[in-house]
Amino acid sequence: MELRALLCWASLATALEETLLNTKLETADLKWVTYPQAEGQWEELSGLDEEQHSVRTYEVCDMKRPGGQAHWLRTGWVPRRGAVHVYATIRFTMMECLSLPRASRSCKETFTVFYYESEADTATAHTPAWMENPYIKVDTVAAEHLTRKRPGAEATGKVNIKTLRLGPLSKAGFYLAFQDQGACMALLSLHLFYKKCSWLITNLTYFPETVPRELVVPVAGSCVANAVPTANPSPSLYCREDGQWAEQQVTGCSCAPGYEAAESNKVCRACGQGTFKPQIGDESCLPCPANSHSNNIGSPVCLCRIGYYRARSDPRSSPCTTPPSAPRSVVHHLNGSTLRLEWSAPLESGGREDLTYAVRCRECRPGGSCLPCGGDMTFDPGPRDLVEPWVAIRGLRPDVTYTFEVAALNGVSTLATGPPPFEPVNVTTDREVPPAVSDIRVTRSSPSSLILSWAIPRAPSGAVLDYEVKYHEKGAEGPSSVRFLKTSENRAELRGLKRGASYLVQVRARSEAGYGPFGQEHHSQTQLDESESWREQLALIAGTAVVGVVLVLVVVIIAVLCLRKQSNGREVEYSDKHGQYLIGHGTKVYIDPFTYEDPNEAVREFAKEIDVSYVKIEEVIGAGEFGEVCRGRLKAPGKKESCVAIKTLKGGYTERQRREFLSEASIMGQFEHPNIIRLEGVVTNSVPVMILTEFMENGALDSFLRLNDGQFTVIQLVGMLRGIASGMRYLAEMSYVHRDLAARNILVNSNLVCKVSDFGLSRFLEENSSDPTYTSSLGGKIPIRWTAPEAIAFRKFTSASDAWSYGIVMWEVMSFGERPYWDMSNQDVINAIEQDYRLPPPPDCPTSLHQLMLDCWQKDRNARPRFPQVVSALDKMIRNPASLKIVARENGGASHPLLDQRQPHYSAFGSVGEWLRAIKMGRYEESFAAAGFGSFEVVSQISAEDLLRIGVTLAGHQKKILASVQHMKSQAKPGAPGGTGGPAQQF
């Protein structure tokens, strides 16, 4: 089948014909052998062909013998020259029997052709025998055109041309024989030839001239000059028996680097000057990248110009670049023995993006000589490979002049000649910092703790403000093993130590001038057993028991008072300080970490410490007030690896910032609910400090909804709201007030489960925070659009104020992440709420859901629903989906007039794209333009079918666009209102 298919393919090139014998070219007698030697036999004659050239012919016409006689004519021996099949083209004329006057019944109008193979010219007049065997019959030839002889006229007729195929041949040569058995004919010429495939170049592959040995013959090709094979086996093509190449796809050769295909893929041409080709392939030559050149033809790479370089990791097609210039505007901030350097990026980055910085330090003596700084100095995050334009340097000695050289580097800096340019800065430390703390004493030790004390050093610039204790286990190496403790007294208790372990301790003091240097390391050791401290522990147990009894009594009294207040139908309020809290009915009570004398104790109590070696940070996914938010992996021994979210505390933090950062972990660690973000643990014993929580794949709810606008059903949205309400019910039962409930603080996992997050961070935003969501109010930052009016005015945060915020979250969810109150200013929002205006229902919002929102926005906080009631109401809606099909009307009751956000008049938009962006459908701007909807006149006629054709497949998006078009039509009617102004101006 494959061979038959190859024979059916069209040919790639014309076949060549190689002549073995052509009587037209013979000028002497042919002297072919005839048999028998009798009268009436074949006769050799001379004649003229159609072109009046002299040719040798044979004629026969024996009509005398009735019954016919076989007349044989045999050519000379013809070498086949490797041909397997030979073609014979015979030119002859044949007399019509009826036109012959003496024609007998044995007159024929045909003759027969035979051939005989032999290894040499061995035939004689009698051998081989003149019969069909040993001769091999080729064909009996009949004339298509007969010559007629009319009385008194010359014979007329056409020349017959017949081509026969001989073979297959296997011996060195052959004879061709003609047998006449009663015909009157003339053999005008004989052309013996064979066919072969001519040489061929296709797809950069050369195939030689080939004589076919079989029906089809595979021929191996070779790549043309400057081409290389790219496939194994080498490319091949089939030569057919008729001398034609079978057409098939030829692949396997491509031009070498520095060469491109040309002349219809027949040659590989060298790339010209100024161009190059870096790899093997069919691509064209490319112009040299920036700052490079090629002076020679056939270049696989362009060389960099003087002063420009290409890094080893850069591809050959990348431009050549230079090292960056020096950083600019280096400034320093000195705080005692700690220095922070900051600088601006260099003017010239060298054309690269892998910019890093390196800082070198030299200590200059009064005599003028400068030496490298000592090993006691530390750089944070390091002296080299800095990606941010700052570095913190610790361990500076007082009254010393330092020279810091800041250099910018990139991927080609190591290839450049000479050192990189740098920007120097000289810093002289103050001599006023406290001296090193020495004479550390162990006043008491136990198997897990050490109590140390030391003499108060003399501070030249005033009193010592506090101390920093640095300690680590002897033999432990690396920054993760070092711990720090701050104390305001000249004593410290080191807790959580290993039994019978040796520790190295250093202390430094801080005055108004900053920190002094650390003193010499002091060796201390914990006890092996507890025999020496049992008395202290016994006293501690007794004291704890007494305190516990007192606390139980106080809690019981508070619970009774709270139950009485609840029986009067009034909600218990929470003060601004979380330390005042209630006991829930059989529920664990939230404890404010700031009620602890040492907030770090709250972290140890409620958050699990995780070894930093179990944590792997994979990528940064966001940034917060205190540092970066990353995605990573947690692999604790004996547990399955899990994906976690990691909040990190940025460098240069104060102790207050560290305490407030970790307070969120102290809060989160007290909660355990499927709709509350789960705390995995904290990393506090290494830098950076981390908080690890479960990873929520879909991120914040507001951005997730905006990204999937119109893609969720009402039931799905109500299910999300039910999960949020369930989490808030749990927090309310634990007597915790969130204060910052908003869709941005709700996280969504891959199963669309919503979980409440962000416990505490928003309460610590500083006054100079740039986040526009939070506005200053009575000394703190408040998210105005989500906060109840009593909380804005009097900072009275309660579970009822969280209910108000929950109503705003409901509106955000049903509007797919729309910003509450749109572009109204915060002051306009406050004024509108004071005048009892409320948000209108989002598009297609069920009436029951908007009514629940209005209930949450009651001015009287005691009239707002509690979270158990909210959960119950949402459960009823989910069980009765028909209630969600009643869509809210865009007007409110008498007690709750609704804010009106009318769409501006379409004439206010400069283009269709601007209109699409205004209705949050800007993603379809290019699709509208490509489909011809470029004017409002055309857009006003758009239909749902048009939207599908454009590519708007989401039903929610179709509704929004068609509703806006309908509004546009109403605006175009005569007398229609203009409808200008923002939402804050139209109530």
Curated annotation (Swiss-Prot):
It catalyses: L-tyrosyl-[protein] + ATP = O-phospho-L-tyrosyl-[protein] + ADP + H(+). Phosphorylated; autophosphorylation is stimulated by EFNB2. Pfam families: EphA2_TM (PF14575), Ephrin_lbd (PF01404), Ephrin_rec_like (PF07699), fn3 (PF00041), PK_Tyr_Ser-Thr (PF07714), SAM_1 (PF00536). Disulfide bonds join C61-C184, C97-C107. Residues 16-539 are extracellular. Its main location: membrane. Expressed in various organ systems, including lung, liver, kidney, intestine, muscle and heart. Expressed in myogenic progenitor cells. Residues 323-432, 436-529 form the Fibronectin type-III domain. SMART domains: EPH_lbd, Ephrin_rec_like, FN3, SAM, TyrKc. Glycans are attached at N203, N335, N426. Residues 1-15 form the signal peptide. Residues 965-987 are annotated as: Disordered. The modification Phosphoserine is found at S769, S770, S911, S943. One of its GO terms (molecular function) is ephrin receptor activity. Residues 976-987 have a biased composition (Gly residues). Residues 561-987 are cytoplasmic. Heterotetramer upon binding of the ligand. The heterotetramer is composed of an ephrin dimer and a receptor dimer. Oligomerization is probably required to induce biological responses. Interacts with RASA1; the interaction depends on EPHB4 tyrosine-phosphorylation. Receptor tyrosine kinase which binds promiscuously transmembrane ephrin-B family ligands residing on adjacent cells, leading to contact-dependent bidirectional signaling into neighboring cells. The signaling pathway downstream of the receptor is referred to as forward signaling while the signaling pathway downstream of the ephrin ligand is referred to as reverse signaling. This is Ephrin type-B receptor 4. It comes from Mus musculus (Mouse). The gene is Ephb4.
